[in-house]
Amino acid sequence: LPGGANPMAMLQKMQQDMAEAQESLESETTEVTVGGGAIKVVITGHQRVQSVEINPEVIDLDDEEWLTDLQDLLVAAVNQSIEQSQAMAAERMEAITGGLGDIPGLGGLLG
């Protein structure tokens, strides 16, 4: 190991950094807007939906087809938000582990 570093100390530091990253992801958010501003979804780094905003100016509740479209847009917005949140979390973990989480058997030790 470089500089005679203690592997256990390095592992403990990595675990501590990962715990801190997990904690910060709880308060970090990502935002997705779909349908030309019809729907906005905000989700945390832990994939918890924080808010869903529906813009009443673009919605025609008397149009049955629009209601179906609105449901489809909502599903798309939530799914895109989850994907962005997962990517944000993966980036954070990759920065800490440097890819070590991909080593079989080691991932469980890191978090």
What do these predicted ranges mean?
Residues L1-E31, E83-G111:
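Long amphipathic alpha-helical segments used for membrane anchoring, targeting, substrate engagement
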Residues P56-I59:
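A short acidic/small-residue loop/turn micro-motif
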Residues P2-A5, L61-D72:
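Residues at secondary-structure transition points
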